């Protein structure tokens, strides 16, 4: 199971937020992907 990405904080840089958003999206995709 992939680890949940850590929220970088309210004063994170846009780059950090973008990276977090991408990691979070991938994490959710891993969780919701059907197991065949």
UniProtKB/Swiss-Prot annotation:
Positions where Tyrosine amide occurs in the chain: 36
Cited PROSITE patterns: PANCREATIC_HORMONE_1, PANCREATIC_HORMONE_2
GO cellular component: extracellular space
Record key words, sorted: Amidation, Hormone, Secreted
UniProt-listed GO biological process terms: feeding behavior; neuropeptide signaling pathway
Keyword Secreted listed: yes
A molecular function GO annotation: neuropeptide hormone activity
Compartments reported by the entry: Secreted
Entries under InterPro entries matching the protein: Pancreatic_hormone-like, Pancreatic_hormone-like_CS
Annotated family: Belongs to the NPY family.
Record's function text: Hormone secreted by pancreatic cells that acts as a regulator of pancreatic and gastrointestinal functions probably by signaling through the G protein-coupled receptor NPY4R2.
Protein name: Pancreatic polypeptide
Organism: Erinaceus europaeus (Western European hedgehog)
């Amino acid at each position: 199971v992939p680890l949940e990405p850590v929220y970088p904080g309210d004063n994170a840089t846009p780059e950090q937020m973008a990276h977090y958003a991408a990691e979070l999206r991938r994490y959710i995709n891993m969780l919701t992907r059907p197991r065949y």
